[in-house]
Amino acid sequence: MQTHTTPMYKVLVACEYSGTVRDAFASKGHEAWSCDILPSETPGNHIQDDVLKHLDKGWDLMIAHPPCTYLSNAGARFLYPKGKLNEDRYKLGLKAKKFFIALYNAPINKICVENPISSKIFALPKYSQIIQPYEYGHPIQKRTCLWLKNLSELKPTDIIFKRQST
């Protein structure tokens, strides 16, 4: 009798210091590592460093959560306070975009980059999918974009309410 086994991956969770996603993969038998400039909040495999220095270490899968402070639509109002472009914030946004693109184009076969809806001014690549936390058992609404490479779209697993149309 043959048994089907899921292949185990060497997983990098970029821009994570909580250990939550890393530990979820580890609990399924994967060799999972988190990487962030901050120390990990929990014991486990963690690289405290700039993740860009570690993208070529033979990872099979990367889940990336790059900071969204300067890229998200929510922060767009700070780009044009009083109707004038805040050039310092714009430069920080361009730096954040460069970091995002470096993660998205990493030499890793399977990639998922997660971020909120981005400000159009930074022209990020088109996302693959938008998900909502309430589709996965969390009682909140927060449109979250996923940029996927060689991965299937996520399917809702626990829809706890439907979005109300406005």
Residue ranges: model-predicted function:
Residues 1-166:
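Conserved active-site and SAM-binding loop architecture
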